[in-house]
């Protein structure tokens, strides 16, 4: 009854762990943007969380001005406390009827009461003979704190860097707005390159802790892989099938973290994220998540523990795994290539959530049946193994519920997300919780000298075999009463003879007087053993 009482909790954990848990942040914030712009174009918006003393550069490249024209460039740098304040800036501008034609409109109506750094560069000549436009002048409104940069900074102040138009003065979310205007009657186009490089490189302030997290997790997975390899090498003759599954999950987890770290490091160095590398990382993550769910499923079914094989059920397990991988891969790729289309990402996640719900129910039913079978067989070793696994799931449930309450209170139920530096925890926590559960599973199913005690044994254990042998031996004489009878050729068979003397005579001829003398001769003491016993007794006397 105690095991059954924990089944709803285990089902809740699987729901939390497989359905409610948010995916890893799809794309790190870039540090360099190259955007084409032409006559009649609107304003360009760049959002990013930046460290103090981050240099913002703007370059006007590849000008194409068949007719000479004078351009006016305006830019605004605005810091804000709330991370989610400008997620829909276009709607805010439309609501305030602001088109950035004047500085007052933007800084008073939209940016008030926060700090708004602004500047403009007028009368920039552009004609068909120009290959590059002159550098823009730096804003005069630069806080003094930005001048004193640390000596160990990755991006020290360089007076010869004339492309810098602004510099941040504190850590936090920033909005950079750029507008290029010219004569409305003249056609022109060019490309704008905006770069934001801080003390740690091009990576954003919200992504840098996540990059360190992936590096640490990659090292931890490497250590786990080495430990599991040493364990398996020491007891390679007695390895169970489930231990090969665990090795595969460890390898995929190590590869996943390495690819994510490589992507974040590449973004930090180059300022541009690689969609190909991100898609590869998402595919690796989908394979790992699929294999982890299959591992939990076959463990709950008792594969290798109470069943030597799953038979036709294995086809259903593989089918569910293939479906899950397809849906997980589609959802992950949609988060990368269609990150701005939230509705499409949500639509891609619906089949995945439904499939996770089905897996949750299947695991719940199978795990309950497996523990019931072990309890009926009185197999204390295997039952204790599943009990420890249950306690691990209960711990994960409590940890998940506590974190979800904290996350909802911190990020969902507030109008202003001021604690933007803790956003990386929302992505890293579920990965770390998965790592902890995997670590416990490794410990429970670790290779050892007594590895086969967790393996499948036919119906009964050794202790039950001893009881069964005793029962068979004790009742062996009862089975020897049966004798062959000759069928009658004509009519109904004769009733058995009731002559007691004939029965007794048959018993005396076919059954020894002492059953022990015939059945257990090896238990009788030999003459030599009797003599040795008497000799030992005489020595004692």
UniProtKB/Swiss-Prot annotation:
It is a multi-pass membrane protein. It holds the Pfam family TMEM87A-B_GOLD. The gene is tmem87a. Glycans are attached at residues 52, 109, 148, 189. It comes from the Eukaryota. Disulfide bonds join 65-116, 82-416. This is Transmembrane protein 87A. It is found in: Cell membrane; Golgi apparatus membrane.
């Amino acid at each position: 009854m105690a095991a059954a009482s924990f089944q709803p909790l285990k089902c809740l954990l699987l729901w939390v762990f497989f359905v409610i848990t948010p995916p890893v942040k799809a794309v790190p914030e870039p540090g360099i943007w190259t955007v084409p712009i032409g006559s009649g174009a609107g304003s360009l918006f760049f959002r990013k969380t930046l460290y103090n003393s981050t240099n913002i550069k703007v370059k006007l490249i590849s000008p194409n001005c068949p007719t000479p024209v004078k351009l006016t460039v305006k830019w605004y740098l605005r810091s804000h406390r709330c991370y989610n304040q400008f997620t829909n800036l276009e709607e805010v501008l439309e609501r305030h009827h602001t088109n950035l034609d004047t500085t007052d409109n933007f800084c008073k109506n939209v940016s008030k009461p926060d700090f708004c750094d602004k500047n403009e560069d007028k009368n920039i000549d552009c004609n068909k003979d120009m290959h590059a436009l002159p550098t823009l002048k730096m804003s005069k409104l630069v806080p003094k704190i930005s001048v004193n940069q640390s000596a160990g900074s990755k991006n020290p102040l360089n007076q010869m860097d004339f492309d810098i138009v602004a510099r941040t003065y504190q850590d936090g979310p920033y909005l950079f707005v750029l507008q290029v205007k010219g004569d409305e009657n003249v056609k022109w186009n060019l490309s704008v390159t905006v770069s934001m490089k801080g003390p740690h490189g091009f990576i954003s302030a919200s992504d840098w802790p996540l990059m360190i997290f992936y590096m640490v997790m990659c090292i931890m997975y490497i250590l786990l892989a080495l430990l599991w390899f040493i364990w398996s090498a020491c007891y390679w003759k007695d390895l169970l099938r489930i231990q090969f599954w665990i090795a595969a999950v460890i390898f995929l987890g190590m590869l996943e973290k390495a690819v994510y770290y490589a992507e974040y490091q590449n973004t930090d160095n180059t300022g541009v994220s690689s969609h190909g590398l991100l898609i590869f990382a998402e595919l690796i993550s989908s394979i790992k998540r699929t294999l982890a769910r299959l591992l939990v499923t076959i463990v709950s079914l008792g594969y290798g523990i109470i069943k030597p094989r799953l038979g036709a059920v294995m086809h259903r397990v593989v089918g569910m795994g293939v479906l899950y991988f397809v849906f997980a891969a589609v959802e992950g790729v949609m988060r990368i290539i269609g990150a701005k289309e939230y509705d499409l990402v949500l639509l891609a996640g619906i089949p995945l959530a439904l499939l996770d719900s089905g897996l949750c129910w299947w695991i719940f039913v199978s795990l309950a049946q497996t523990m019931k079978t072990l309890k009926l067989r009185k197999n204390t070793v295997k039952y204790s193994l599943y009990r420890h696994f249950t306690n691990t799931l209960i711990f994960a449930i409590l940890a998940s519920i506590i974190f979800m309450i904290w996350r909802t209170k911190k990020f969902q139920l507030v109008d202003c997300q001021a604690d933007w530096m803790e956003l990386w925890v929302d992505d890293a926590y579920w990965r770390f919780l998965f790592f902890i559960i995997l670590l416990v599973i490794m410990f429970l199913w670790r290779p050892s000298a007594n590895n086969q005690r967790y393996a499948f044994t036919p119906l009964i254990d050794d202790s039950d075999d001893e009881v069964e042998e005793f029962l068979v031996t004790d009742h062996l004489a009862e089975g020897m009463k049966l004798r062959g009878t000759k069928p009658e050729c004509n009519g109904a068979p004769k009733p058995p003879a009731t002559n007691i003397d004939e029965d007794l005579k048959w018993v005396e001829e076919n059954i020894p007087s002492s059953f022990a003398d015939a059945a257990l001769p090896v238990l009788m003491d030999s003459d030599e053993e009797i003599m040795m016993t008497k000799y030992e007794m005489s020595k004692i006397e």
